[in-house]
Amino acid sequence: MRGLRPALSTFIFLLLITGGVYPLLTTVLGQWWFPWQANGSLIREGDTVRGSALIGQNFTGNGYFQGRPSATAEMPYNPQASGGSNLAVSNPELDKQIAARVAALRAANPDASTNVPVELVTASASGLDNNITPQAAVWQIPRVAKARNLSVEQLTQLIAKYSQQPLVKYIGQPVVNIVELNLALDKLDE
């Protein structure tokens, strides 16, 4: 019985620290120092939530830039089902999926001149990625310009405006947040 008391005391102490104090402290500090990020990085227009800056959306219309394909089951970009497809590079099913995506993108973008950018046909590890490279966005300009009656120059400037550089110049690559870019497109129509 004597040896049980220190073990029980340690258990209760660690339970209070790791199950109560630590989560409460991180929640309070997160809300205090980083309220936008701690609440999901929500993009709002007035009182309406239009999306999150961290999670992609399923834009399928010709007048929208499309992001990476989602690997989430049942519903695209479902944050509760986050995860990759887990198909190996050597898996023939992955080849079929990529070939089907390339064919669909070629059909939807007949005026695109170069090869389909790889990030438009491969899902990210989370299946929820909202960023593509500026080159992948530029590849889609002819389709979006035609659907929205906008000039190539207008869309090129919009992509440049919403391109984000990596925090460290030589680590990473510039990206465009598709959700923010498409919301900016909708504002052009207003």
UniProtKB/Swiss-Prot annotation:
One of its GO terms (cellular component) is plasma membrane. InterPro entries: KdpC (IPR003820). It is a single-pass membrane protein. Keywords: ATP-binding, Cell inner membrane, Cell membrane, Ion transport, Membrane, Nucleotide-binding, Potassium, Potassium transport, Transmembrane, Transmembrane helix, Transport. The keyword Transport applies. The chain crosses the membrane at residues 10-30. It holds the Pfam family KdpC. The keyword Membrane applies. It is found in: Cell inner membrane. One of its GO terms (molecular function) is ATP binding. Belongs to the KdpC family. The system is composed of three essential subunits: KdpA, KdpB and KdpC. HAMAP family: KdpC. Part of the high-affinity ATP-driven potassium transport (or Kdp) system, which catalyzes the hydrolysis of ATP coupled with the electrogenic transport of potassium into the cytoplasm. This subunit acts as a catalytic chaperone that increases the ATP-binding affinity of the ATP-hydrolyzing subunit KdpB by the formation of a transient KdpB/KdpC/ATP ternary complex. PANTHER family: POTASSIUM-TRANSPORTING ATPASE C CHAIN, POTASSIUM-TRANSPORTING ATPASE KDPC SUBUNIT. This is Potassium-transporting ATPase KdpC subunit. It comes from Escherichia coli (strain SE11). The gene is kdpC.
